[in-house]
Amino acid sequence: MYFPMIELTLVLLASSNLAMSVRKEIRAPQTLSRGWGDDISWVQTYEEGLYNAKKRNKPLMVIHHLEDCQYCQALKKVFAESDEAQTLAQEQFIMLNLMHETTDKNLSPDGQYVPRIMFIDPTLTVRADITGRYSNRRYTYEPQDLPLLIENMNKAIHLLQTEL
């Protein structure tokens, strides 16, 4: 009777030590950038983005993405590493990245997919004319499309200056 009690005590001790040695993965605190650029001032909601776009007379750039999407992660990496894209985003745009859909159907004119990047001008018009290179998913970009994305960012700025 004495030995089974010792065995039970040893099993309990071993399992509690094992549980203590298994640590949860320590993750960095999540910021509004979600990895797209920590030096960029990000808005929290679509409504806040629209308000700031109109108030500050800047285009709103909306990035739809998901954390578990490999294509989103690859695009995020090249966007965050591009000095030109980061500077444009910091200085010329109201920036929003979303991991959920908005109720504005104008932000999904050809469907809900990720990654999807859309531009809204300060008159609150979704610029459906600023697209990526694919005809079936007009607002998606891949990492190798970064030059086109930067060109489209510049186009959004230029249209703002010439149309308004």
From Swiss-Prot:
Annotated signal peptide: 1-19
Report the InterPro entries cross-referenced here. AGR/TXD (IPR051099), Thioredoxin-like_sf (IPR036249)
Question: What is the top-level taxon of the source organism?
Answer: Eukaryota
Places the protein is found: Endoplasmic reticulum; Cytoplasm
Cite a single Pfam family from the UniProt record.
Answer: Thioredoxin_7
Q: Which CDD domains match?
A: AGR
Principal location listed in the UniProt entry: endoplasmic reticulum
Q: Where is this motif: Prevents secretion from ER?
A: 161-164
Transmembrane feature ranges: none
Q: Which SUPFAM superfamilies match?
A: Thioredoxin-like
Provide this UniProt record's keywords sorted from A to Z.
Answer: Cytoplasm, Endoplasmic reticulum, Signal
* Entry's Gene Ontology cellular component terms: endoplasmic reticulum
Q: Which family does it belong to?
A: Belongs to the AGR family.
Q: What does this protein do?
A: Required for calcium-mediated regulation of ciliary beat frequency in the airway.
Identification of the protein by name = Anterior gradient protein 3
What organism is listed for this UniProt entry?
Xenopus tropicalis (Western clawed frog)
